[in-house]
Design a protein with these regions (language model features):
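Catalytic cores of DNA base-excision repair glycosylases
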Residues: 2-209
Length: 209
């Protein structure tokens, strides 16, 4: 049974309250590094990405540098990450697209971001919200799992349905905080196996609604 909008908002706001200082866990110093790091994070932990990116960014600090590298040269820096050969191919192509289509700058709109090789809706939403402060809500595995476990969405909901539901429940200024807090909540409490959410009764207390 999916929660009402009021109850779902209560759950999300309680999760934000549990992790009010949640920040992005990927390391980056500019928009290009953020884009690359988020692309690398697919099916890989942020911790693993953060171990790989210092060497990668030192070797290829700009789209220009990455575009002229070979796929093997890029792959050698990310070989411990999942799907690293595909990611190397996407990074090289994406870097060239940034030069050809966007004067070497990372674009700010979802349509433009999703035109880049290897960039899907989730990556675009992270770059928009974290990199540019543009309201967007990214759905990763933690967010999807939490929303289904807590009946914010139906169990069969797609990532896009999760995204639209949360954006309908919370005001835009809370979307990024909710995304960050849910990642921390998913890692620390709402595990895929043996979630510990029941230790936080405020998540289930709707007596004041």
């Amino acid at each position: 049974m999916v929660l009402s909008k009021k109850r779902a908002r209560k759950v999300l706001e309680e999760i934000i309250a549990l992790f009010p200082d949640a920040k992005p866990s990927l390391d980056f110093t500019n928009h290009f590094e953020l884009l690359v790091a988020v692309m690398l994070s697919a099916q890989t932990t942020d911790a693993a990405v953060n171990k790989a990116t210092p060497g990668l960014f030192a070797a290829f600090p700009t789209p220009q540098a990455m575009s002229v590298a070979t796929e093997n040269e890029i792959a050698s820096h990310i070989s411990r990450l999942g799907l690293y050969r595909n990611k190397a191919k996407f990074l090289k192509k994406c870097a060239q697209q940034l030069l050809d289509d966007f004067d070497g700058q990372v674009p700010q709109t979802r349509e433009e971001l999703e035109s880049l090789a290897g960039v899907g809706r989730k990556t675009a939403n992270v770059v928009m919200s974290v990199g540019f402060g543009i309201p967007a809500f990214a759905v990763d595995t933690h967010v999807e799992r939490i929303c289904k476990h807590h009946d914010i969405v139906k169990k069969s909901a797609t990532p896009l349905e999760v995204e639209k539901r949360v954006m309908d429940i919370l005001p835009p200024e809370q979307w990024l905080a909710a995304h960050q807090a849910m990642i921390y909540f998913g890692r620390a409490i709402c595990h895929p196996k043996n979630p510990e959410c029941d230790q936080y009764p405020q998540l289930y207390d709707f007596s004041d609604l």
